[in-house]
């Protein structure tokens, strides 16, 4: 199975740290954030990885190259300046990903074990996403658990999921966010969910990055 790490975002809220550096290359525990994802994927047995690039993408490519020195094989999906949003980036990379694949946001830090996603038996057109308890910056959440009524408590999308390639069937290339697609497919019962209680941090601001590094150093 292959995995895709989303790394094309502009990181506007992380300025000035992202003025000359893509957000996934910012250091957490003395390693680029995205390197933690690569190590976790490798530990789960996933060595074929696709990374999408836009803002300062050459910094990622120059650091990881083809991935061999990290024990993996990396392919890159180059996007237009400004990026294509999450779903647009996935759709652009579909020719590199195969029938079923895992996607991870490159700007989160987590100890979630993707081995669980690899064991799922998804039907054609389906997806499975990981939700987490709502952080302070997203108190209202994003999605209810799929086995509960839609009006149930909503949790925050972690940016981690597994998708069948035909989940995106009929969607044209271009700038396209993922949220509206997930909501539509949830209503069609094509998306299952789980709630993960564990380490997860969205590195959305310099303050959050500093807080995370302080915790990890303690």
Task: Name the predicted role of every residue range.
Residues 6, 29, 51-53, 78, ...:
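Small/polar loops that bind or transfer phosphate-bearing groups
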Residues 13, 59-62, 92, 113, ...:
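Phosphate- and divalent-cation-binding pockets in alpha/beta enzyme and binding domains
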Residues 35, 87, 179:
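Glycine-rich phosphate-binding loop at the start of an alpha helix
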Residues 61, 65-142:
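Conserved beta-loop-beta/alpha segment of the NTase-like Rossmann-fold superfamily
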Residues 102, 109, 115-122, 134-137, ...:
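Catalytic-core segments of class I nucleotidyltransferases/pyrophosphorylases
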